Amino acid sequence: MITAIIFGLLSAVLWGTSDFLSRETSKSIGHYLTTGYVQFIGFIVPISIALFYHEQIPTFDLPLLLLNCLLGIFLFFSFIFLYRGLTEGAMSIVAPVTSGSAPAFAVILFVIILGQTLTKIEAYAIAGVIIGVTLSGVRFAQLKKDILRTGFPRSNAANKKASQAEMEHEDHEKTRRIVKGLDLSLLCSASTAVVYLGLGILIPRLGWLFPAIILKGAGALVAFAFLLLARKKFKIPDTRTFLLLFLMGVLDVGGLLVFNYGISIAGNLLPLVVTFSGLSGLVILICAYLVYHERLERIQAVGIFLVITAAAILLYFQ
């Protein structure tokens, strides 16, 4: 059990750090290109590992190969939904909902489809971690701003009343951001849960390395094909942005490889690996606190305490 938790936590640290760095690259080259570059770099790294260590290619039958490629498509969409949600929706809604619901969806799929079983203690502790992760991302002060914020400019609001049409438009924009943020975060979580489920099927049959190669390769192909078909502007990043992208790609695929290896040795503890990998949202919160000096709200401290308590319960009753 300790091993499953450790690998889940390691993947959370790597994924959370990579996602935290995406703010700057997304501003520089956009979310779509950031996704494409991160997936491509994530494809190169495991291939290099396989060549360096002379890893033997496992036997792929057609259904497993198609499943692996399909997961790459879901991986691409999970990134796009997340980045669009953070940009076009309310961040104070997208971040906690995504961090909390993705592991929840995945655990449900593991139990229903893969037949994974949980003891009552494990089920309660996993629920505690998921709730804690969700609470740790909630910032009521920012949430209030997001709900009250409107997308319609009111330049002369101090001198004259806004027309009824303007007020209706403002209400529509406010509602749109809240609903769109929630919709996209749930779509991201559902896509991520499907990827987790697919990896739970592939890794026991193909090992932990090669599914990551195909997953990232398919994700990169889909990303750049989308950019081409959608006629998005292709931009070569400057040196600083490229270095950030390279670091993000290495951290992201590092998290995937650690996650995959955790799955390969977890056995019936697969839900624990997935649940604790969901702490990537908490890692982003800690990075924001250290770099931007964002103070924790009381409810966030409660969420962190709940996560630590749930983890301690799991370790105590192992």
Language-model regions: role of each:
Residues 254, 259-318:
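C-terminal appended segment following the main domain
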Residues 16, 20, 47, 72-77, ...:
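Hydrophobic/small/kink-forming positions within alpha-helical transmembrane segments
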Residues 62, 98, 115-135, 139-150, ...:
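Loop-to-transmembrane alpha-helix entry segments
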Residues 70-75, 83-134, 210-218, 268-290:
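Specific alpha-helical transmembrane segments that line the substrate/conduction pathway
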Residues 1-13, 22-33, 37-73, 77-89, ...:
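Membrane-interface interhelical linkers
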Residues 46-56, 106-118, 189-204, 251-268, ...:
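Hydrophobic alpha-helical transmembrane segments in multi-pass integral membrane proteins
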Residues 188-233:
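Aromatic-anchored, glycine/proline-accented short structural segments
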Residues 13, 40-47, 123-133, 190, ...:
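Hydrophobic alpha-helical transmembrane segments of multipass integral membrane proteins
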